[in-house]
């Protein structure tokens, strides 16, 4: 659990640098870009699936009876939300840029720590990969004669072949487990070192009289306040855009309810 928390903290603090710890061939992508891409995909999926649900409802017996015409207003609603997203895009981009700028120093320090630990750990990872490949090749060599025997033998030899393969599989499992345990033993000190470095960085922030933490908090609060103020016009546009849709829905619903009530009274 501690290792998982440490990993998440490092990924957050180092931003795109931590991502390239393992993936050097991909172009850098800022945290805001990743959040924006995820939000865009989510909204698009929600929009498409929502339209399908509305279409299914209007095609049902109840939907036809109520005749709310939700599908007619769906494009208007999605267009309004798309407009809101476009208006808020630059505002939220500015907020994220400011936040990244304020934490640049801390992220650079953590990135440096991560690179140093990576350099120390890399030989053990390379050695583990080499041994793993050797074990796989050894296993393949041991299994190859049995595979040939299976091709040449009859069905009655299948059980005999399975008995021969079982010890090989157990041996492979035990040897792999030994390599994993050895790798875990080698990496443990460096995991502790990285955790201690992170703790030291955070402790240093506290020991500075809390000045840097207070500064981060104050600037984040300021940026959030600015974001809220700049978002007000866009949210007001959203409210104005939804009013006709809500009013149309209200009229259709009341009309359907009145018609249904009349039918009940005539029965």
From Swiss-Prot:
It is found in: Secreted. GO terms for molecular function: amyloid-beta binding; apolipoprotein A-I receptor binding; apolipoprotein receptor binding; chemorepellent activity; cholesterol binding; cholesterol transfer activity; enzyme binding; heat shock protein binding. One of its GO terms (biological process) is negative regulation of cell adhesion molecule production. Residues 1-18 form the signal peptide. Gene3D superfamilies: 1.20.5.20, 6.10.140.380, Apolipoprotein (1.20.120.20). Changing residue 173 to S: In Boston; correlated with decreased levels of HDL cholesterol; correlated with decreased serum cellular cholesterol efflux; correlated with decreased lecithin-cholesterol acyltransferase (LCAT) activity. The modification Methionine sulfoxide is found at residues 110, 136. Pfam families: Apolipoprotein. Sequence repeats lie at residues 68-89, 90-111, 112-122, 123-144, 145-166, 167-188, 189-210, 211-232, 233-243, 244-267. The keyword S-adenosyl-L-methionine does not apply. Changing residue 180 to E: In Oita; 60% of normal apoA-I and normal HDL cholesterol levels; rapidly cleared from plasma. Residues 68-267 are annotated as: 10 X approximate tandem repeats. Transmembrane segments: none annotated. Changing residue 92 to I: Confirmed at protein level. Major protein of plasma HDL, also found in chylomicrons. Synthesized in the liver and small intestine. The oxidized form at Met-110 and Met-136 is increased in individuals with increased risk for coronary artery disease, such as in carrier of the eNOSa/b genotype and exposure to cigarette smoking. It is also present in increased levels in aortic lesions relative to native ApoA-I and increased levels are seen with increasing severity of disease. It is linked to Hypoalphalipoproteinemia, primary, 2: An autosomal recessive disorder of lipoprotein metabolism, biochemically characterized by severe apoA-I deficiency and severely reduced serum high-density lipoprotein cholesterol (HDL-C). Affected individuals have undetectable serum levels of apoA-I, and develop xanthomas and corneal opacities. The disease is generally associated with atherosclerosis and markedly increased cardiovascular risk. Homodimer. Interacts with NAXE and CLU. Component of a sperm activating protein complex (SPAP), consisting of APOA1, an immunoglobulin heavy chain, an immunoglobulin light chain and albumin. Interacts with NDRG1. Interacts with SCGB3A2. Interacts with NAXE and YJEFN3. Participates in the reverse transport of cholesterol from tissues to the liver for excretion by promoting cholesterol efflux from tissues and by acting as a cofactor for the lecithin cholesterol acyltransferase (LCAT). As part of the SPAP complex, activates spermatozoa motility. This is Apolipoprotein A-I. It comes from Homo sapiens. The gene is APOA1.
